[in-house]
């Protein structure tokens, strides 16, 4: 069955999701988008992308529609989600990717207006369930869960790596740092911002800031609740990030044993979400990689029962591919 999707917020994640649908061949049809930007600009930004390159097909727009190839879909510009009638366009699932409606009590408006399910492309509040594909997606219950969070890109990287280690060695506690590409909420030049570190010019600074990824791990791996914490270092690249995780585990081990356990998980239960590599890669090598986490075996360090590992991730493309997977998964039980 084709899953019909509406996208609220056609920014970086909204457009990456659209491209990922096309690239994956998933049985998903985008029937409408809602964004306050004019349609001509939206079409241009979909057609030309500084990271992904030119869209492989014709893209055009009118005042009411965007056309990609031979497929047209509605484009609305409603500030208030309450004015969106998703039932009129037949949307089964709405991707909430504006960044403004991360509280499920607000995002639920999409369901009130005709969508069967709502997926928030960010960490959320009051959601029915937070899902990281490959880690806890089997907890999804179509009867109970209407508003779902896809967690953050960093949690999607951290969780598979942590699960692989915890399942074999039992994580006691740990700290993580995400070396993260700059994002749209930072400044190009120094200027006012609620976070005074993020107020500084993104392209010429390493910017320490907060991340909720480590604490959020307890939402998808309850046995690790309260056992991880960390922060982010935003760096001057537009995409391509890395999560550095250091944990104490239940027994002494070796780097070889840790790598073997992660490799087994990447080839087994976490295949497609966790990828294992022994190549000496850098961040640009994983741009457009669809995996949630690319485990870098060459960076594994072990001292007794202390384990340090690194996983790369394309914080836009990898995350958007998980949205495609989640839509497909949820769509099976509509």
Question: Where do the model's predicted regions map?
Answer:
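Hydrophobic alpha-helical scaffolding
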Residues: 151-152, 206-208, 248, 313
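Acidic, glycine-rich segments within the central catalytic cores of soluble metabolic enzymes
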Residues: 167, 171-238
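Short clusters of hydrophobic/aromatic residues that line enzyme substrate/ligand-binding pockets
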Residues: 66, 131-133, 147, 188-189, ...
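C-terminal active-site/capping subdomain that shapes the small-molecule cofactor and substrate pocket
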Residues: 230, 242, 246-334
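Short, solvent-exposed beta-strand edge segments and adjacent coil->beta transition regions
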Residues: 144-145, 201-203, 240-244, 306-308
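Generic secondary-structure signature for well-ordered alpha-helical cores
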Residues: 22-26, 163-171, 181-184, 211, ...
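Alpha-helical scaffold segments in soluble metabolic enzymes
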Residues: 12, 16, 20, 44, ...
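N-terminal Rossmann-like NAD(P) cofactor-binding subdomain of oxidoreductases
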Residues: 1-199, 301, 325, 333-334
């Amino acid at each position: 069955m084709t899953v019909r999707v509406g996208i609220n917020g056609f920014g970086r994640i909204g457009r990456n999701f659209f491209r990922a649908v096309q690239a994956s061949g998933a049985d998903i049809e985008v029937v409408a988008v809602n964004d306050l930007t004019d349609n001509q600009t939206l079409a241009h930004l979909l057609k030309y992308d500084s990271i992904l390159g030119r869209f492989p097909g014709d893209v055009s727009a009118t005042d009411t529609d965007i056309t990609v190839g031979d497929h047209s879909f509605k484009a609305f510009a409603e500030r208030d989600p309450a004015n969106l009638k998703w039932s009129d366009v037949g949307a089964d699932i709405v991707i909430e990717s504006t960044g403004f409606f991360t509280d499920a009590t607000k995002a639920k408006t999409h369901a009130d207006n005709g969508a069967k399910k709502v997926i928030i492309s960010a960490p959320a509040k009051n959601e029915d369930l937070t899902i990281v594909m490959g880690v806890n997606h089997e907890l999804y219950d179509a009867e109970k869960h209407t508003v779902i969070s896809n967690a953050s890109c960093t949690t999607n990287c951290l969780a598979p790596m942590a699960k692989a280690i915890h399942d074999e060695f039992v994580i006691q506690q740990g700290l993580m740092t995400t070396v993260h590409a700059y994002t749209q909420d930072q400044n190009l030049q120094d200027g006012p911002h609620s976070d005074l570190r993020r107020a500084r010019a993104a392209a010429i600074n390493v910017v320490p800031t907060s991340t909720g990824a480590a604490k959020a791990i307890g939402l998808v791996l309850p046995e690790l609740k309260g056992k991880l914490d960390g922060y982010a270092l935003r760096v001057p690249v537009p995409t391509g990030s890395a999560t550095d995780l250091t944990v104490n585990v239940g027994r002494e081990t070796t780097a070889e044993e840790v790598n073997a356990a992660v490799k087994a998980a990447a080839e087994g239960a976490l295949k497609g979400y966790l990828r294992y590599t022994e190549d000496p890669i850098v961040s640009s090598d994983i741009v457009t990689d669809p995996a949630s986490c690319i485990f870098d075996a060459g960076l594994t360090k072990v001292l007794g029962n202390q384990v340090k590992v690194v996983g790369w991730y394309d914080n836009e493309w990898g995350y958007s591919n998980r949205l495609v997977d989640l839509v497909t998964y949820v769509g099976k039980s509509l």
